[in-house]
């Protein structure tokens, strides 16, 4: 091998430092728009600083969450529609934080690829910033890892990390009791779980990502990339109003596995499936794959992205509050004295 005249450089190995610096410069304005009380510095330092007192806390408990977007990224990569996956990444983390009763404060991302494409990376991270802005948390740092030989051309991976806080004694779940009402908040589609099965179902259907969507006006790929709904501000408003005993983010495992995570030992849930309409995407998947209702309910959100467990006497007030904040709310069931989730009515 003949060496370059002036010796080898990092660029010769496939790592473009200049592209990385250009990316940071491009995303700084988007990150700056996420600034909130408590943020002490912008991007660029070795670590990010956050002042909990400046954010209004006196005796805070910190809550941390991390997540990814799963194989939904494969659809984004194959179609080139990458703008929304950053919102997915944020939502998967911050929606989990509010289930503990915490306000999301700040967010960090990890973006990894084999060869950095500045425009694509910027679109993704600008999506992350938009998600943070909508959730009220600051994008205070991240890592862009350009790793030649680790990923096929054009591929990338994402991970997100978020920290929130609540005052001591305010953690959820708390005071869940038999008879508590289950309020279901509508999802915006599949969100970010079950996409290995989604992709298999699309393969079985014989449709391509750019084919017209069978249940919507845009392409199939674009429809399946609808971002995960952010429930942060609505959930925090409900918590502040009083009467919320628990929240369950309906992700991998569906309603069947996620709701029991916030119920105390000895209690379960009775859910009436006729209390909301199954979104068309789930009906199409069930029909395409010949899926049974039980399998749907333990795999997908089936139209309910977040469940609030609330005191019976506060259910009407909270329903009205959430509806006023733009949520499609359904009273889907109640907490019962037997463990597990039992269903009545039909979904399919």
Swiss-Prot record:
It catalyses: 2-formamido-N(1)-(5-O-phospho-beta-D-ribosyl)acetamidine + ATP = 5-amino-1-(5-phospho-beta-D-ribosyl)imidazole + ADP + phosphate + H(+). GO terms for cellular component: cytosol. GO terms for molecular function: ATP binding; phosphoribosylamine-glycine ligase activity; phosphoribosylformylglycinamidine cyclo-ligase activity. Signal peptide: none annotated. Keywords: ATP-binding, Cytoplasm, Ligase, Nucleotide-binding, Purine biosynthesis. Its EC number is 6.3.3.1. It is found in: Cytoplasm. It comes from the Bacteria. GO terms for biological process: 'de novo' IMP biosynthetic process; adenine biosynthetic process. Transmembrane segments: none annotated. The keyword ATP-binding applies. Pathway: Purine metabolism; IMP biosynthesis via de novo pathway; 5-amino-1-(5-phospho-D-ribosyl)imidazole from N(2)-formyl-N(1)-(5-phospho-D-ribosyl)glycinamide: step 2/2. Belongs to the AIR synthase family. This is Phosphoribosylformylglycinamidine cyclo-ligase. It comes from Roseobacter denitrificans (strain ATCC 33942 / OCh 114) (Erythrobacter sp. (strain OCh 114)).
